[in-house]
Regions:
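Short N-terminal targeting/anchoring amphipathic segment
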Residues: 4, 67-78, 84-108, 122-124
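Donor nucleotide-sugar binding/catalytic pocket of nucleotide-sugar-dependent glycosyltransferases
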Residues: 124-133, 140-191
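Short hydrophobic beta-strand element within catalytic cores of glycosyltransferases
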Residues: 281-282, 305-309
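Conserved donor-binding/catalytic core segment of Leloir-type glycosyltransferases
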Residues: 194-214, 220-223, 233-235
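Acidic donor-binding loop of glycosyltransferase active sites
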Residues: 274-291
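Nucleotide-activated donor-binding/catalytic signature segment of Leloir-type glycosyltransferases, i.e.
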Residues: 246-270, 274
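A charged, aromatic-enriched C-terminal amphipathic alpha-helix characteristic of glycosyltransferases
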Residues: 330, 343-376
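Glycosyltransferase donor-sugar binding loop
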Residues: 40, 207, 232-247, 265
Length: 377
């Protein structure tokens, strides 16, 4: 059986996904090809082809009219991308097309017959953001396309969203939110700088793509509530902030002796893991974030406590497994108290970390892929 894995994202997070998906299918004995931005590091058994898809336009914040126009333009881009992919797939003629991120590849506004015409292959994939607002007929939404006659199963990362999706697709599979656990880099300049500046203080880190949905405002409001001589704060990752927001963030960091803010992309997963390993606490109190994050998997693997927002997927998991604490998204007093408690009072529960890490082991993909393959005709 021939499987083609497809993705169009250039982010490091997504690169981890599509390469691992391709290598898992190949490792299971399937003839596997990968259509994606980067094929470096994949095994020889996977045939690589660069993707020609156009990137989706970012949605403007705080501009509802412009946002609607961008949604419509993205709907057209999605259909054009499927048309381009169809030509590539005709040459490969796979038995299964597997999308590493259905969120970016499924249409949002189109008749189902047109989608089936553009993608006349059996398909499956991962729906990364599966906890979506209530469905309203006629509104831009990927979920109706999960009803396609060619869909043989959909993977999700958020177990709490499964029931709502069963209306659109009966074969819903819970994927592990696996992570690249490469050995931490030892010669990363930012790591050396962190060690020099922290000087033994407790390190609280916000890592990854830097935007205000990551809870930056909450963290900045919490920092002054904690003693400078006991706590050190790291923000590191590629910024999607405006120039003014970046200037304000840098000014805040430079005004204090317990902050290090680096708004450059973390070079690779080994460097990312080095920053996690050097941290005492991982800050992941994201704002209105309904999904899963493999940052929790990394934190568990490196035995690091986390602080997350209460109530949604990540908060429910942290409370269930006991790998950290939750906080209100807009409560700096509660957040700073949780930071203090996690850094000074909470006992390390190694079994809790081990349970969480085991639940999200990459090897569990094989079970999921076997379930998908059973439905291929």
């Amino acid at each position: 059986m021939k499987v083609t894995v497809i993705d169009c994202s250039v982010s490091g997070h997504r690169e981890t996904y599509y390469k691992q998906f391709a290598q898992t299918w190949a490792g299971m004995g399937y003839e596997t090809s990968l259509i994606a931005p980067d094929g470096k590091g994949i095994q020889e058994a996977v045939a690589f082809q660069p993707v020609s898809a156009l990137p989706l336009l970012p949605l403007p914040a705080g501009k509802p009219l412009q946002k609607k126009l961008v949604v419509l333009r993205n709907a057209v881009i999605r259909l054009r991308n499927l048309y381009r992919l169809r030509r590539s797939l005709q040459r490969l003629n796979p038995d299964l097309v597997f999308f590493a991120c259905l969120d970016d590849m499924l249409p949002t506004l189109a008749p189902l017959w047109l989608f089936n015409l553009l993608l006349p292959y059996q398909w499956s994939g991962l729906l990364v953001q599966s906890a979506l607002p209530p469905y309203h007929r006629g509104m831009p939404d990927t979920r109706p396309f999960l009803r396609s006659k060619n869909c043989v199963g959909v993977g999700i990362l958020n177990e709490y969203s499964a029931k709502d999706l069963e209306t659109f697709q009966r074969h819903i599979l819970l994927f592990p939110d696996f992570a690249d656990l490469s050995a931490p880099a030892t010669n990363y300049p930012l790591l050396r700088k962190l060690k020099e500046k922290a000087r033994g203080r407790k390190v609280i880190s916000l890592l990854g793509s830097i935007n205000f949905r990551k809870g930056i405002k909450l963290l900045l409001e919490s920092i002054p509530l904690l003693p400078k001589d006991e706590y050190f704060f790291l923000i590191a990752g590629k910024s999607s902030l405006t120039a003014q927001q970046e200037n304000d963030l840098r000014a805040f960091g430079e005004s204090r002796n317990n902050c290090l803010f680096s708004l450059e992309k973390i070079p690779d997963e080994s460097c990312f893991n080095a920053l996690i390993a050097e941290s005492d606490l991982i800050f992941a109190a994201y704002k209105q974030f309904t999904g899963s994050s493999n940052l929790l998997t990394k934190a568990a693997a490196f035995r690091k406590l986390v602080i997350v927002s209460r109530g949604l997927c990540m908060g429910r998991r942290v409370e269930q497994y006991g790998t950290g604490q939750t906080t209100g998204e807009d409560n700096a007093g509660e957040c700073s108290a949780a930071i203090r408690s996690l850094c000074t009072e909470t006992k390390m529960n190694t079994q809790a970390f081990a349970r969480y890490a085991h639940e999200h082991e990459v090897e569990k993909l094989i079970t999921c892929f076997n379930q998908i393959s059973k439905h291929i005709q």
